[in-house]
Amino acid sequence: MDIRKEYLDFFKSKGHEIITSAPLVPDDATLLFTNAGMVPFKSIFTGDVPRPNPPIRTSCQTCIRAGGKHNDLDNVGYTARHHTFFEMLGNFSFGEYFKKDAISYAWEFVTEVLKLPKDKLYVTVHEKDDEAYELWQKFIQKDRIYRFGDKDNFWAMGDTGPCGPCSEIFYDQGSEHFNSDEDYMGGDGDRFLEIWNLVFMQFERSKDGTMTPLPKPSIDTGMGLERVTAIKEDKFSNYDSSLFMPLINEVAKLCHKQYEYKTGASYRVISDHIRSVTFLLAQGVNFDKEGRGYVLRRILRRAVRHGYLLGIKEPFMYKLVDKVVELMGEHYSYLKEKKEYVKELIKLEEERFLATIVAGLDLFNEELAKTSSNVFSGEVAFKLYDTYGFPLDLTADMLREKGLSVDEAKFDALMNEQKARAKASWKGSGDAAKESGDFKTLLEEFGENKFIGYDNLKSSSKVLALLNSEFKRVNELKNGEIGYVMLDSTPFYAQSGGQCGDTGMLGENQALDTKKYFGLNLSMIEAKNSIKIGDIVLCEVSLNRLEIRRHHSATHLLQAALRNVLGAHIAQAGSSVEADKLRFDFSHPKPVTKEELEKIENFVNEAILKGAPAKIEIMDIQNAKKSGAIALFGEKYADKVRVLTLGPSKELCGGTHVENLNEIGSFFIVRESGVSAGVRRIEAVCSKAALELSKEFRKEINDIKDSLKGADPLLSIKKLKDEIKSLQNDLKNASNTKDLDVKDINGVKVVVSKFDGDIKSKIDELKNKFDKVVVFLAGVKDGKVSLGSGSKNTSIKAGELVKTVAPIVGGGGGGRDDFATAGGKDESKIDEALNAATKFISEKL
């Protein structure tokens, strides 16, 4: 049974509109991730947004609980129900139906669609909710209805705001399977399992605790798909269900060990975490050092470490993405589009962590052996985090298995010190002034002012309001004062969608910039003469707008070219459009090759040469997406959107553009670079800026020719390269003749010495020179000690040698049997380290 589909179809038959799952990154600054089905509707429940039409909706919402207040990470894998990623089925009424219908719908779905046995079902209500208690008796015996207090059966969004009693449906898994002291209705055992929570939002709680009945009470319900699937399939753990076992079986194949529930926590951790990682990456969250990206990194690294426990010591998580897409790609089609991109990002991150995990685990185990109390050193935990990439909760996870904890206070202190150093030069951004500005009163008085600049670069407009530099309302801006002007209608485009704000003249005053604040289009001016509320001013947008719109249209063509050349996984991660340049950030796991860049550039220029008129359509959002228009993932759009078609490009966009592609003239890529893990950047120019750049290039080429006295630059460059190569060979030969102290021990060449050059290159050189050789070199640069060891065709293991000697100079490190490196702090101990290396080698040989 496809429970997800059955649920949505059932509520659709009851008049509910099916809403697509909102992004995992919510439009809510108070939340790290979308962690419940009601999150996308929060502003409707609070009354900040008008109730929709129809006012009853249903959804299957993807959720993440792995950070912040709602964090299930530590429990995942060790319990039957906890997950970092899950799907929440829900039906919602915004002032339409209430308890009677909510209870009736729930009972009908559970008993007639899911066909769960009625004799296995129990219900709870709030102890004071007589209405719900009476309503339930129409469907279930009174002795199966339990009344509990606020702790169990009252829900609130916060200390203030909408709240109300709730009613929960429970499923009895049987006393033959669960018989602990807590296995009773209301206990903490697993016998009676909550499957559905119906929240009756009927009060508004004020700061003093007073609860006032809402004029239009609402319904918010939630049922976990993973939990109800397990029940329907008669499984006692979510992980035994068809949602997880295919993934667990894949893990078993990778580690070549059979899965057993009692000892299988690592399998469950991996099967859960790969779902979170896949969805977050597919939705545009990337691995990072902070914020959501760091939570993503923590989840993956925790899974990699559990793979390590299973004996998997190479990248493997990326191999599980195919199975996630197979299981969930039909409902979440973007998983199919982003599959290869997600796999590449995961593999790169796995390789990055696996490169340090051995050294990190060695440090962890060394400190563990020294730990005499039940508390692990916070300093070492911080070093594991800072040097080896071990998130604190990963270290805590490993300690929990040993019955220990970590000194989090010391870890936090060191982390705060590091953050303080990083932010020492930060001076603020003025956002506080914007937050406290008089925008709300302007919105209440005038509403949002109209932009009329798609077709007009000039207008005669009325000054509705003026704000000073602190965003406070004033009646007048005097000569020399900087402030903001709100016009009744404005031809100035406010910075949005990556396009910079317009400049120009506003009467006799220069418009320095235009931005949108809380829906208000405001132009920043430096007053030349007095400007007052009620003035009628002649507005004229700078001709820079013509170049801006050319670069904006070129940006759309660039995205179409990227998707054509690199693949459908390309998604915008940021952009900047100005009069003389454009910048476009996009999701891609590796650098774009020269050949690919050439294809991208050619694609754009061919579209420009062909020419095509801009086509603008106003469509409802669903039809726009169905038509193939590209939308920013996670962006909130109005019900009606502006769809722009420019030749091969079709996007949702409210910016200004050319009327025909041939207005762009030409397009030239200036550079390609990396921004962060999985995000690349292309900077480019078009139109006049491209012409100016071509002139600069021509001048540079002519200057090179002049310096070469007319010779062919390419031939001259080849000649210079040949000379450089010859000199490098001479230098290499010279370095070979400068013998280090080479000894012979039982037929093995042994080199133990100080060395100030490139240690790795010298070790490679000596390994190439001798058939059997052991090398140990030590050098100092910028006060830091560098150690390196190499071994070829001997019994000496370079990694073991380095690991033994490094502590002498106050360092640590390791590596392979044939090559290893380490760092240290105490250069005064180099001679002692060299003696120790000589002794180690002599004893082994």
From Swiss-Prot:
SMART domains: tRNA_SAD. One of its GO terms (cellular component) is cytosol. It catalyses: tRNA(Ala) + L-alanine + ATP = L-alanyl-tRNA(Ala) + AMP + diphosphate. Binds 1 zinc ion per subunit. Its EC number is 6.1.1.7. It comes from the Bacteria. Keywords: Aminoacyl-tRNA synthetase, ATP-binding, Cytoplasm, Ligase, Metal-binding, Nucleotide-binding, Protein biosynthesis, RNA-binding, tRNA-binding, Zinc. GO terms for biological process: alanyl-tRNA aminoacylation; negative regulation of DNA-templated transcription. Zn(2+) binds at residues 552, 556, 653, 657. Coiled coil: none annotated. One of its GO terms (molecular function) is ATP binding. It is an enzyme of class 6 (ligase). Its cofactor is Zn(2+). It is found in: Cytoplasm. Consists of three domains; the N-terminal catalytic domain, the editing domain and the C-terminal C-Ala domain. The editing domain removes incorrectly charged amino acids, while the C-Ala domain, along with tRNA(Ala), serves as a bridge to cooperatively bring together the editing and aminoacylation centers thus stimulating deacylation of misacylated tRNAs. NCBIfam families: alaS (TIGR00344). Catalyzes the attachment of alanine to tRNA(Ala) in a two-step reaction: alanine is first activated by ATP to form Ala-AMP and then transferred to the acceptor end of tRNA(Ala). Also edits incorrectly charged Ser-tRNA(Ala) and Gly-tRNA(Ala) via its editing domain. Belongs to the class-II aminoacyl-tRNA synthetase family. This is Alanine--tRNA ligase. It comes from Campylobacter fetus subsp. fetus (strain 82-40). The lineage of its organism: Bacteria, Pseudomonadati, Campylobacterota, Epsilonproteobacteria, Campylobacterales. The gene is alaS.
